[in-house]
Amino acid sequence: VLASQSVSDDIRDDLETMELNTNRLLDLVNQLLDFRKTETQGFQLNFVECDVSELLQKTYKRFKPLARERGLALSIETPESLYASVDREGLTKIISNLLTNAIKYSETYIRIRLYSEGERLLLSVCNDGLVIPVEMREEIFKPFIQYKTGTLRSVPGTGIGLALARSLAELHEGTLCMEDSMENNCFLLSLPLRH
């Protein structure tokens, strides 16, 4: 219908809005189902040797237009290659949720850094949004919790993204937390390089 030339601009706009909202609803349902699967051990991981640098670059490219649309500077620092034994789908969901969250809450920039220390793969995603108070830094990883304050613009969402990301990190025998910083919001993912 959208491709039809006989559709008026108003109807085309309405149809595009409906399609966008349908996709958002579908994404929400899929996130809720994924979260439920992680809680009931129904989410099966398939560990494979993967170039995480390449996977991160591909995910970064998907989110770059969204960041640009919001006027955000999005930077990435990654080695040419960094191999680890991961579930590609699960890790992509973790990264996507961290970037979605950063884009929603950032004011001017998002910095992504991938590196390794010892036998750990580390990924940090930092943004300059309103700094989350120390007492809320564990709360935001609970399902359906969002940090809100009177000065923060209204941000759409359900509060399931960080809960799903942490659950997937734990299934990878890893961790996802906020680093101690009073200057910005930095989320740190730590996963074993090998399983």
Language model region names:
Residues 156, 161, 165:
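Short alpha-helical Gxxx[C/S/T] motif in the catalytic ATP-binding
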Residues 20-25:
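Short alpha-helical segment of the dimerization/phosphotransfer core of two-component systems
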Residues 36-47:
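Helix-loop junction within the histidine kinase core
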Residues 46-51, 68, 73-82:
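Conserved catalytic submotifs in the C-terminal HATPase_c
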Residues 132-144:
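Short conserved segment of the HATPase_c
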Residues 109-119:
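Short beta-strand/loop element within the Bergerat-fold HATPase_c
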